[in-house]
Protein backbone atom coordinates (compact mmCIF):
# COMPACT_ATOMS: atom_id res chain seq x y z
CA UNK A 1 0.00 0.00 0.00
CA UNK A 2 1.32 3.44 -0.90
CA UNK A 3 2.08 5.75 2.00
CA UNK A 4 0.15 8.57 0.35
CA UNK A 5 -3.00 6.41 0.10
CA UNK A 6 -2.68 5.11 3.63
CA UNK A 7 -5.44 5.97 6.02
CA UNK A 8 -4.11 8.39 8.64
CA UNK A 9 -4.37 7.22 12.21
CA UNK A 10 -6.58 9.33 14.40
CA UNK A 11 -4.66 11.16 17.08
CA UNK A 12 -7.88 11.50 19.04
CA UNK A 13 -8.34 8.91 21.76
CA UNK A 14 -11.48 6.77 21.61
CA UNK A 15 -14.22 7.81 23.95
CA UNK A 16 -14.28 4.79 26.22
CA UNK A 17 -10.65 3.98 26.89
CA UNK A 18 -8.56 4.39 30.00
CA UNK A 19 -7.26 7.81 28.92
CA UNK A 20 -10.63 9.21 29.90
CA UNK A 21 -10.88 9.51 33.66
CA UNK A 22 -14.65 8.95 33.59
CA UNK A 23 -14.27 5.26 32.73
CA UNK A 24 -11.76 4.52 35.47
CA UNK A 25 -13.73 6.59 37.99
CA UNK A 26 -16.99 4.82 37.16
CA UNK A 27 -15.32 1.42 37.40
CA UNK A 28 -13.78 2.18 40.79
CA UNK A 29 -17.05 3.61 42.14
CA UNK A 30 -19.04 0.59 40.98
CA UNK A 31 -16.41 -1.75 42.46
CA UNK A 32 -16.68 0.08 45.78
CA UNK A 33 -20.46 -0.17 45.70
CA UNK A 34 -20.23 -3.89 44.92
CA UNK A 35 -17.88 -4.41 47.88
CA UNK A 36 -20.32 -2.58 50.18
CA UNK A 37 -23.24 -4.65 48.89
CA UNK A 38 -21.37 -7.93 49.36
CA UNK A 39 -20.21 -7.06 52.88
CA UNK A 40 -23.72 -6.07 54.01
CA UNK A 41 -25.25 -9.14 52.34
CA UNK A 42 -27.61 -6.93 50.38
CA UNK A 43 -30.39 -8.03 48.09
CA UNK A 44 -29.12 -10.25 45.27
CA UNK A 45 -30.43 -7.87 42.64
CA UNK A 46 -28.14 -5.09 43.90
CA UNK A 47 -25.12 -7.37 43.65
CA UNK A 48 -26.19 -8.71 40.26
CA UNK A 49 -26.77 -5.31 38.68
CA UNK A 50 -23.51 -3.84 39.95
CA UNK A 51 -21.48 -6.89 38.88
CA UNK A 52 -23.16 -6.80 35.45
CA UNK A 53 -22.20 -3.14 35.06
CA UNK A 54 -18.63 -3.96 36.07
CA UNK A 55 -18.50 -6.66 33.39
CA UNK A 56 -19.81 -4.26 30.75
CA UNK A 57 -17.28 -1.55 31.66
CA UNK A 58 -14.44 -4.09 31.64
CA UNK A 59 -15.68 -5.33 28.24
CA UNK A 60 -15.47 -1.81 26.81
CA UNK A 61 -12.03 -1.26 28.33
CA UNK A 62 -10.77 -4.51 26.78
CA UNK A 63 -12.24 -3.57 23.40
CA UNK A 64 -10.37 -0.27 23.43
CA UNK A 65 -7.12 -1.59 24.93
CA UNK A 66 -6.92 -4.41 22.38
CA UNK A 67 -7.92 -1.90 19.64
CA UNK A 68 -10.70 -4.14 18.43
CA UNK A 69 -12.82 -1.07 17.72
CA UNK A 70 -10.67 -0.52 14.61
CA UNK A 71 -11.52 -4.01 13.34
CA UNK A 72 -15.25 -3.82 14.05
CA UNK A 73 -15.96 -0.84 11.82
CA UNK A 74 -19.62 -1.64 11.28
CA UNK A 75 -20.37 -0.50 14.85
CA UNK A 76 -20.47 3.18 15.71
CA UNK A 77 -18.48 3.00 18.94
CA UNK A 78 -19.19 6.49 20.29
CA UNK A 79 -22.91 5.84 19.93
CA UNK A 80 -22.46 2.50 21.69
CA UNK A 81 -20.58 4.30 24.49
CA UNK A 82 -23.40 6.82 24.78
CA UNK A 83 -26.01 4.07 24.98
CA UNK A 84 -23.95 2.23 27.59
CA UNK A 85 -23.59 5.37 29.71
CA UNK A 86 -27.32 6.07 29.63
CA UNK A 87 -28.34 2.50 30.45
CA UNK A 88 -25.73 2.30 33.23
CA UNK A 89 -27.01 5.56 34.69
CA UNK A 90 -30.60 4.30 34.70
CA UNK A 91 -29.81 0.94 36.31
CA UNK A 92 -27.45 2.35 38.91
CA UNK A 93 -29.86 5.15 39.81
CA UNK A 94 -32.54 2.56 40.59
CA UNK A 95 -30.06 0.59 42.71
CA UNK A 96 -28.92 3.78 44.45
CA UNK A 97 -32.46 4.88 45.30
CA UNK A 98 -33.41 1.47 46.66
CA UNK A 99 -30.16 1.01 48.60
CA UNK A 100 -30.20 4.47 50.15
CA UNK A 101 -33.58 3.77 51.75
CA UNK A 102 -31.77 1.54 54.25
CA UNK A 103 -29.91 4.42 55.93
CA UNK A 104 -31.22 3.83 59.44
CA UNK A 105 -30.71 0.06 59.48
CA UNK A 106 -27.55 -0.66 57.50
CA UNK A 107 -25.13 2.19 57.06
CA UNK A 108 -22.75 0.37 54.70
CA UNK A 109 -25.63 -0.30 52.32
CA UNK A 110 -26.28 3.44 52.34
CA UNK A 111 -22.61 4.02 51.47
CA UNK A 112 -22.93 1.58 48.56
CA UNK A 113 -26.02 3.43 47.36
CA UNK A 114 -24.23 6.76 47.54
CA UNK A 115 -21.33 5.29 45.56
CA UNK A 116 -23.84 4.13 42.94
CA UNK A 117 -25.33 7.62 42.85
CA UNK A 118 -21.86 9.10 42.34
CA UNK A 119 -21.27 6.58 39.53
CA UNK A 120 -24.54 7.77 37.96
CA UNK A 121 -23.22 11.34 37.97
CA UNK A 122 -19.95 10.18 36.40
CA UNK A 123 -21.88 8.25 33.72
CA UNK A 124 -23.92 11.36 32.93
CA UNK A 125 -20.70 13.36 32.56
CA UNK A 126 -19.33 10.64 30.28
CA UNK A 127 -22.50 10.74 28.18
CA UNK A 128 -22.17 14.52 27.86
CA UNK A 129 -18.51 14.23 26.79
CA UNK A 130 -19.32 11.52 24.23
CA UNK A 131 -22.22 13.59 22.85
CA UNK A 132 -20.00 16.66 22.56
CA UNK A 133 -17.32 14.68 20.71
CA UNK A 134 -19.91 13.16 18.37
CA UNK A 135 -21.36 16.59 17.57
CA UNK A 136 -17.90 18.04 16.95
CA UNK A 137 -16.97 15.15 14.65
CA UNK A 138 -20.27 15.46 12.78
CA UNK A 139 -19.77 19.20 12.28
CA UNK A 140 -16.23 18.58 11.07
CA UNK A 141 -17.50 15.89 8.67
CA UNK A 142 -20.19 18.19 7.28
CA UNK A 143 -17.70 20.99 6.82
CA UNK A 144 -19.22 23.32 9.37
CA UNK A 145 -16.57 25.44 11.03
CA UNK A 146 -16.14 24.34 14.63
CA UNK A 147 -15.64 27.24 17.01
CA UNK A 148 -13.65 26.40 20.11
CA UNK A 149 -13.54 28.64 23.12
CA UNK A 150 -10.46 28.00 25.14
CA UNK A 151 -11.45 30.01 28.15
CA UNK A 152 -14.62 31.86 29.08
CA UNK A 153 -12.50 34.38 30.98
CA UNK A 154 -10.73 35.45 27.79
CA UNK A 155 -13.64 37.70 26.83
CA UNK A 156 -13.79 39.27 30.28
CA UNK A 157 -10.41 40.95 29.98
CA UNK A 158 -10.19 43.19 26.90
CA UNK A 159 -6.91 43.80 25.23
CA UNK A 160 -5.00 46.92 26.14
CA UNK A 161 -2.55 48.79 24.01
CA UNK A 162 -2.50 51.04 20.98
CA UNK A 163 -4.15 48.44 18.66
CA UNK A 164 -6.89 47.50 21.12
CA UNK A 165 -10.46 48.45 20.26
CA UNK A 166 -11.72 51.53 22.08
CA UNK A 167 -14.96 51.66 24.03
CA UNK A 168 -17.57 54.10 22.77
CA UNK A 169 -17.90 57.15 25.01
UniProtKB/Swiss-Prot annotation:
The chain crosses the membrane at residues 22-42, 46-66, 79-99, 110-130. One of its GO terms (molecular function) is cytokine activity. It is a multi-pass membrane protein. Highly expressed in testis. Keywords: Chemotaxis, Cytokine, Membrane, Transmembrane, Transmembrane helix. The keyword Membrane applies. It is found in: Membrane. One of its GO terms (biological process) is chemotaxis. Coiled coil: none annotated. It comes from the Eukaryota. One of its GO terms (cellular component) is membrane. Residues 17-135 form the MARVEL domain. Belongs to the chemokine-like factor family. This is CKLF-like MARVEL transmembrane domain-containing protein 1. The lineage of its organism: Eukaryota, Metazoa, Chordata, Craniata, Vertebrata.
